[in-house]
């Protein structure tokens, strides 16, 4: 029976998106969901603060007169700053605040080719005599980059900042059973994506699928891969022996020419449990004393239908599992 082509249904609300893909062949829910989740969490490009310069501050363990928060707290607040770029290249945001009040992200002077997505973010709290002057460098990147990996790209006394570039805050997926007509062994993949608002869930998913597709195209380019692959030696050359103070017994040489199975070798033995039958079917067979594959293969369709708990569906299951090992019921 032809399986219906999978359909994608999407529901996006702001920075949250839910995507349902069905029907999928059994097992494909995890096969598709897991790599997409990993790519979403690690490889979607985004922006982050990479360094900050604060006037009269030499290091992150300083305090600023007239400012409630210390420098470490201010840096932690800046890590939550979400900036959306409309053009490539690093951006410098400038902030000058003085006098009592709460300093929000909206106080930053932002270049025309960028915008702050969360302007209500609290940066610091100033007292009446407080003053805060800073420059923040924002860059594009992927994944997580620790502060010590950032080279000093701007002014002296700037403080490097750990950067989490990924615009995807969280990804969750799970797989459910679904059906199409009489076919019930199908998967439904439900994928949930939360972003920081600089990139929408649909855009993030599209980018993840594009990355995965690009990585997999190498498997379709067989001719190029074959031409570029180095020629392997036709004779196995053992590695040089390890020199030590002990005389180790000589190990037998590895044969690189596997011997074929004897022509009269029987089909490999398999236990009844090894057939992969469902617990219910396995229990029904053993209740009737059918406890081996030999005993099972000695029965016909008619014989098995007489076993309590074995109907048409169970009979089909038994035949399918036997066929995987080249076995069959008695005619």
Swiss-Prot record:
InterPro entries: DNA-dir_RNA_pol_insert (IPR011262), DNA-dir_RNA_pol_RpoA/D/Rpb3 (IPR011263), DNA-dir_RpoA (IPR011773), RBP11-like (IPR036603), RNAP_asu_C (IPR011260), RNApol_insert_sf (IPR036643). It comes from Deinococcus geothermalis (strain DSM 11300 / CIP 105573 / AG-3a). The N-terminal domain is essential for RNAP assembly and basal transcription, whereas the C-terminal domain is involved in interaction with transcriptional regulators and with upstream promoter elements. Residues 1-223 are annotated as: Alpha N-terminal domain (alpha-NTD). Homodimer. The RNAP catalytic core consists of 2 alpha, 1 beta, 1 beta' and 1 omega subunit. When a sigma factor is associated with the core the holoenzyme is formed, which can initiate transcription. Belongs to the RNA polymerase alpha chain family. It comes from the Bacteria. This is DNA-directed RNA polymerase subunit alpha. Keywords: DNA-directed RNA polymerase, Nucleotidyltransferase, Transcription, Transferase. Disulfide bonds: none annotated.
């Amino acid at each position: 029976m032809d399986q219906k082509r999978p359909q994608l249904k999407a529901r996006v609300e702001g920075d949250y998106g839910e995507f349902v893909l069905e029907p999928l062949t059994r097992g494909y829910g995890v096969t598709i969901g897991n790599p997409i989740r990993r790519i979403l969490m690690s490889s979607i490009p985004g922006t982050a603060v990479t360094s900050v310069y604060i006037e009269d501050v030499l290091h992150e363990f300083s305090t600023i007169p007239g400012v409630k928060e210390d420098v470490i707290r201010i840096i932690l607040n800046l890590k939550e700053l979400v900036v959306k770029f409309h053009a490539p290249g690093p951006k410098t945001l400038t902030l000058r605040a003085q006098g009592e009040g709460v300093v929000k992200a909206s106080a930053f002077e932002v270049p025309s080719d960028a915008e702050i997505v969360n302007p209500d973010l609290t940066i610091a709290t100033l007292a009446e005599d407080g003053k805060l002057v800073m420059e923040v460098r924002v860059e594009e990147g992927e994944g997580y980059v620790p502060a010590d990996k950032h080279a000093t790209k701007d002014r002296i006394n700037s403080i490097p900042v750990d950067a989490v570039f990924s615009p995807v805050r969280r990804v969750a997926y799970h797989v459910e059973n679904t059906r199409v007509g009489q076919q019930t062994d199908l998967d439904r993949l439900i994928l949930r994506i939360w972003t920081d608002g600089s990139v929408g869930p649909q855009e993030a998913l599209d980018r993840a699928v594009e990355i995965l597709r690009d990585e997999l195209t190498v498997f379709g380019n067989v001719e190029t891969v074959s031409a570029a692959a180095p020629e392997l030696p036709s004779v196995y050359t053992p590695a040089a022996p390890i020199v030590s103070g002990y005389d180790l017994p000589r190990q037998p040489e590895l044969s690189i020419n596997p011997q074929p199975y004897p022509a009269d070798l029987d089909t490999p033995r398999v236990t009844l449990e090894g057939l992969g039958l469902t617990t219910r079917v396995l229990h029904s067979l053993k209740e009737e004393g059918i406890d081996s594959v030999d005993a099972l293969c000695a029965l016909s369709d008619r014989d098995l239908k007489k076993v309590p708990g074995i109907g048409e569906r169970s009979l089909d299951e038994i035949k399918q599992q036997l066929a995987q090992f080249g076995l069959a019921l008695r005619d």
